[in-house]
UniProtKB/Swiss-Prot annotation:
The species this protein was found in: Haemophilus influenzae (strain PittGG)
Subunit relationships: Heterodimer of an alpha and a beta chain.
Protein's recorded name: Integration host factor subunit beta
HAMAP family noted in UniProt: IHF_beta
Record has Transcription regulation as a keyword: yes
InterPro entries, per the entry: Hist_DNA-bd, Histone-like_DNA-bd_CS, IHF-like_DNA-bd_dom_sf, IHF_beta
Gene encoding the protein: ihfB
GO CC annotations on file: chromosome; cytosol
Length: 94
């Protein structure tokens, strides 16, 4: 689902709210999550999951095209861990 599809579904579910207001709310929520991660904070949405940063150590990588070794610096990457309720909802037993 894309951000625009999410906004369309929210507009259909809440027809009394203007589409522009829904768009602004979705953008604000995503911006708040991004800012929190940028500040090094963890964001937890109970029943859904949590967003945090994982820190990658510097390492020696390889250029796949040339095969040359490349030094990769340390970096932080966003990480999402699904909550118990979300895991239970998507765990479809075949």
């Amino acid at each position: 689902m894309t951000k625009s599809e999410l906004m369309e579904k929210l507009s259909a579910k809440q027809p009394t709210l203007p589409a522009k207001e829904i768009e602004n709310m979705v953008k604000d929520i995503l911006e708040f999550i991004s800012q929190s991660l940028e500040n090094g904070d963890r964001v937890e949405v109970r029943g859904f999951g949590s967003f945090s940063l994982h820190h990658r150590q510097p390492r020696l990588g390889r250029n796949p095209k040339t095969g040359d070794s490349v030094n990769l610096s340390a970096k932080s990457v966003p990480y999402f861990k699904a909550g118990k309720e979300l895991k239970a909802r998507v765990d479809v037993q075949a």
